[in-house]
Amino acid sequence: MSKEKFERTKPHVNIGTIGHVDHGKTTLTAAITMVLAKEGKASATKYDEIDKAPEEKERGITINTAHVEYETEVRHYAHVDCPGHADYVKNMITGAAQMDGAILVVSAADGPMPQTREHILLASRVGVQYIVVFLNKSDQVDDPELIELVEMEVRELLSEYGFPGDDVPIIVGSALKVIENPEDAEATKCIYELMEAVDTYIPTPERPVDKPFLMPIEDVFTITGRGTVATGRVESGVLKIGDEVEIVGLKEEKKKTVCTGVEMFRKLLDQAMAGDNIGALLRGIQREEIERGQVLSKPGSVKPHKKFVGQVYVLKKEEGGRHTPFFNGYRPQFYFRTTDVTGSISLPEGVEMVMPGDHIDMNVELITPVAMHEGLRFAIREGGRTVGSGVVTTVSE
């Protein structure tokens, strides 16, 4: 059977459910698909189908993730749900499932628990800026004042991690009651309220095309009589012939040049857009002035940095990672976009060592500067194999 064509009529947004184990993330995911399926905007997915999420490999790390998709009147959503806590940690740090926003599920009967806090912290670190809260299991709480108390606790917790706790939409309901009575308007009302909040509170993300031009350089070659060509996949923005671009990274100084030609599949283009694999002809640049691992970018839009703070997941032995812990001053390679750069690690105060399977904040100092920004993903490698995966949380200098 041929694949269905993806109809792009509505804006697309990636979201996911986060929260403590057994607070009802998967039940809520199933409930959303059931309610929207009645309007032909989703195919109903049962709890068991989501719960036995298939294993996926992202940068060599095994992650269980379930993906469902559905629509509202205004948008198309891809929704991720992870069965285990470790899967969430890996997912959010590796960016295996990018989230534009998240639905934080908190049991009204229990209130915020340790993983509630940990998921909020992770979301703030990896750049998930928008959270909508679903207070689940409200059918198990008789006293409305208790629900109000839990709501206050959740708002305080969100504020503690830099989210606008007072403004975050909080919807109260019971996902299980929805699944048991999908025809009951009173039970399903909470799902409509939740989707309304997600539609309005989580903004449509800026498309890569609308961001400044950036292309990581994968290869460089010379065309006799024409000049130097840099090839790569355009990460964001648009490049037109005659545009001024900057070559950034690996060297202390940036170089400016003009793009005098754009080629794709040996055809000449007027312009290249995010997602295109291209060759860019650069005026007056010598072959030795540019190399893989640098980026071509809109002048002034990116800076090269040597020091940064990263949130890192360290692979377990079973995932092909290290068998032993590492200590302060560990010097692996950091793989950004297209190249490895050696860097040394300093661990947070009070942390003596890092074990395989841990996730941790670390300060890194690279030996040469790399074009980077907050939210950029990287891998940590040792002798060509990946031993960790991370995301830049703060750029220092």
Curated annotation (Swiss-Prot):
Role summary: GTP hydrolase that promotes the GTP-dependent binding of aminoacyl-tRNA to the A-site of ribosomes during protein biosynthesis.
CDD domains: EF_Tu (cd01884), EFTU_II (cd03697), EFTU_III (cd03707)
Residues annotated for GTP binding in this entry: 19-26, 81-85, 136-139
Keywords, alphabetical: Cytoplasm, Elongation factor, GTP-binding, Hydrolase, Magnesium, Metal-binding, Nucleotide-binding, Protein biosynthesis
Subcellular localization: Cytoplasm
Spans annotated as G2: 60-64
Renumbered residue ranges of the record's region G5: 174-176
Name of this protein: Elongation factor Tu
A GO-annotated cellular component: cytosol
Binding site for Mg(2+): 26
Main subcellular localisation: cytoplasm
Region (G4): 136-139
Subunit structure: Monomer.
PANTHER family, per database record: ELONGATION FACTOR TU, MITOCHONDRIAL (PTHR43721:SF22), ELONGATION FACTOR TU-RELATED (PTHR43721)
EC number: 3.6.5.3
Reaction catalysis annotation: GTP + H2O = GDP + phosphate + H(+)
Record domain tr-type G: where: 10-206
GO molecular function list: GTP binding; GTPase activity; translation elongation factor activity
Region described as G1: 19-26
Highest rank taxon of the organism: Bacteria
Keyword Magnesium part of the UniProt annotation: yes
Family classification: Belongs to the TRAFAC class translation factor GTPase superfamily. Classic translation factor GTPase family. EF-Tu/EF-1A subfamily.
Xref: HAMAP family: EF_Tu_B
Enzyme class: hydrolase
